[in-house]
């Protein structure tokens, strides 16, 4: 609870700041916050009165008029923040409650294996972000690799790869090698370039809307590359790294750039460091989103996710 109050709320306010009006004239930012020291009622009184055991949350807000340069700052009451009791419970409307984590919906990556009628294994995985579109991957009996973006109709994985900027078959093979599932996906993919891939994916995500490359680019960029719209969060990144066994893939490599913890913002290992087993474990546990390591060709570094 204390960690969330110190760090989590700060990140929430940082994510929503700054709020601007339609014309961009007024800009509202949250510059600080604090809690009252004591709750209005004790735990016993909250149960007797059927109220929530909570402390007032007060936020310092700053309003900036970008046209006149005028800045106003004041403290506002944001609401009552439920407070955990000494026994780890919460009192909500007089009833004592506990929080149960919902693992199925927790951010991260999930795998599944099914079988077709002939007993062939069909693989699937789902990437669930803290906020943003789900990505659901699956293979079929013909080894075609499909993806669903935000619960829409499935498309060959190569359509998504093209829409992310790797447009031609040659570029895709250069990146992934002659992976059989990628080659099989080409047979179901009518697109042959970045723009065609963009429009094909756009048709599935926004069926019925006029096709335009600009609109498709804007949609893909906002869906996957805007931190306010797509975020795995620290928990999701930690679980993603663990499931993909990041530590096994980076052990023995030499860092081409500093490894920075997403949990604390601190440098876990400096550029030029050879990654030992112990250091690889530390990097994985710190939810580092990616690493740049030195490649066999000295002029080319490799990004490991």
Regions found by a protein language model. Name each.
Residues 1-305:
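N-terminal non-catalytic structural scaffold regions of very large proteins
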